[in-house]
Swiss-Prot record:
Name of this chain's protein: Ribosome maturation factor RimP
NCBIfam families: PRK00092.2-2
Keywords, in A-Z order: Cytoplasm, Ribosome biogenesis
Entry function: Required for maturation of 30S ribosomal subunits.
Segments of skewed composition (Basic and acidic residues): 153-171
Keyword presence, Nucleus: no
Organism: Streptomyces coelicolor (strain ATCC BAA-471 / A3(2) / M145)
Recorded superkingdom: Bacteria
Biological processes per GO annotation: ribosomal small subunit assembly; translation
Transmembrane segments: none
Length: 177
């Protein structure tokens, strides 16, 4: 896809995505056999549920139908979110990943896996897991030291907010009995 077409698609679609309360993260046009696929990735600070994705998909489809931005040939429009193990490339991505475990590739070389505790304009406050039973430590990581960052999926993390709510619910049920 030419840069001109990519820029034109972004200029055309970004206001529609923003009007739905979402951020346009990525646009890609790929050829699959004779068909083309226009993939649009959207997100927001509060996440994008299926209803919001369906709404923005309909709005984008209508806008693309009334313009020639995709040219004459057939294409398929796919609208989705970045996924669980998204790359963090912009400040807002780090803010959204607060309290998530992230794998960092450092500019100096090396790798770091840590949980984002806080984000400001200069960098991140992290919690680095302890090794061999040791307590976690905190670390400051300036944005300039980060080469790449990707959210890690956690399957067995204890969610303290839900645990506290469950304990409260159990006490309430026991008190009622």
């Amino acid at each position: 896809m030419s840069t001109t077409q990519s820029e034109r698609l972004r200029e055309l679609l970004e206001p529609l995505v923003a009007s739905q309360g979402l951020d346009l993260e990525e646009i890609a046009v790929d050829s699959v056999g004779r068909r083309r696929v226009l993939s649009v990735v959207v997100d927001s600070d509060t996440g994008a549920d299926l209803d919001r994705i369906a709404d923005v998909s309909r709005a984008l489809s209508a806008k693309l139908d009334e313009t020639d931005a995709m040219g004459e040939g057939e294409y398929t429009l796919e609208v989705g979110t970045p996924g669980a193990e998204r790359s963090l490339t912009q400040h807002r991505h780090y803010v959204r990943a607060t309290d998530r475990l992230v794998r960092f590739q450092l500019r100096e070389g090396g790798e770091l896996v840590a949980r984002i505790l806080a984000v400001d304009e200069d960098g991140l406050d992290l919690e680095v897991p302890g090794v061999k039973g040791r307590r976690p430590t905190t670390r400051r990581l300036p944005f300039g030291d980060i080469d790449k960052a990707r959210v890690q999926v956690e399957f067995n993390r204890k969610d303290t907010k839900n645990d506290n709510q469950t304990e409260h619910d159990n006490k309430t049920e026991e008190e009622e009995a």
